[in-house]
A protein has these predicted regions:
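Sec/Tat signal peptide C-region and signal peptidase I cleavage site
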Residues: 7-14
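Cleavable N-terminal signal peptides
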Residues: 1-2, 12
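A residue-level marker of the well-folded mature domains of exported/periplasmic proteins
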Residues: 14-323
Length: 323
């Protein structure tokens, strides 16, 4: 399988043989996959245990990669992204004694740990920031693939915008209807330019690698953008308002750590603001854009969500958005 390599020779010292299969966007997508890669790199540095990494280049290779690793005794095997669900189902059925951890989707088998996130909660927070920074009264959203998971980001964002200012207008577009929509920066830029022409002065991208085109278009027009998954503030310093953090790297790290100490469990881990699974990024790249008032307001919203005083509607619960 293309992209297979071992980063360290220390694996013989470990009780586990951890592995990961990235999705076809690859671990250098500067977004979702890269966030997992960062977490895995930290695990290797912290423990000295090598993690075998496979990067399939097409959908057919995903199942092959998972089965290849399982046949060679690797576990737990982390599968990155919703698109891997069918492949994980097949591999986990074929290798029922192998532990699999699936990020962002559900496979209901006794050897699969499913890690899910409350993206709507994190998106609510960046929606508050978008509303506080807009001067036109219009903000934008560019999603990747048109699926319920991405609509969850969009709906949470809209609720945050509305909570801060109910008079705001939110423009929203999806990039496409296949997984390729997460790797199309030119289309992302095109959609963003259209939104800007229609008045948007803050644009949130939940689109994987497509986001780089969104951020470039925003920077070119002198408007603000919001990143996703990993901290993308560095990509366009000065126009990146923040990033909605989805701590998927920690999911991989925790899976390996739990397997190594005997506490790994199949089933579900659902991570929101209360679990620090999602959040927003504040660092040297956007510090000057975030006023004390903005920071206080976002923290107010965060605390209210954790306390249950604000309930952010989950689009995936009923395929609807109240905003």
């Amino acid at each position: 399988i293309a992209g297979a390599f071992v980063l360290s020779a220390s694996i013989a010292q470990a009780d586990i043989k951890p592995a990961v299969v990235y999705d076809i966007a690859g671990k250098n997508d500067q977004s979702f996959n890269e966030a997992v890669f960062v977490g895995i790199t930290k695990y290797m540095n912290d423990t000295g245990i090598a993690v075998t990494e496979l990067e399939p280049t097409n959908a057919a290779q995903v199942e092959q990669s998972l089965k290849k690793l399982a046949s060679r005794g690797y576990e737990p095997i982390v599968a990155v992204g919703f698109a891997m669900a069918n492949a994980v189902q097949a591999a986990a059925e074929a290798y029922p004694d192998t532990k699999f951890t699936l990020i962002d989707m559900v496979v209901g088998l006794p050897n699969v740990q499913n890690v899910l996130y409350k993206e709507h909660e994190g998106s609510f927070l960046v929606g508050v920031l978008a509303a506080m920074n807009s001067e036109t009264g219009t903000v934008g959203f560019v999603g990747g693939m048109d699926i319920p998971l991405i609509s969850r980001f969009e709906c949470g964002y809209k609720q945050g915008v509305n909570w801060q200012d109910s008079s705001m207008n939110v423009l929203a577009n999806m990039t496409g209807s296949t997984p390729a929509a997460f790797g199309n920066p030119s289309k992302g830029g095109e959609l963003t330019r259209t939104q800007i022409q229609n008045g948007a002065d803050v644009v949130y991208a939940a689109a994987g690698g497509t986001g780089s085109g969104v951020y470039q278009a925003a920077a070119d027009a002198g408007v603000l953008a919001i990143g996703v998954d990993s901290n993308q503030n560095w990509m366009q310093p000065g126009t990146m308002l923040t990033s909605m953090l989805k701590r998927v790297g920690e999911a991989a790290y925790d899976s390996y750590e739990a397997a190594n100490n005997g506490t790994w469990e199949a089933g579900f881990r659902i991570l929101g603001l209360a679990e620090d699974g999602v959040g927003w990024a504040l660092d040297e790249y956007n510090r000057d854009l975030i006023t004390p008032e903005m920071e206080a307001r976002v923290n107010e919203a965060r605390d209210a969500i954790i306390a249950g005083d604000i309930v952010v509607h989950d689009y995936m619960a009923d395929s609807s958005c109240p905003i």
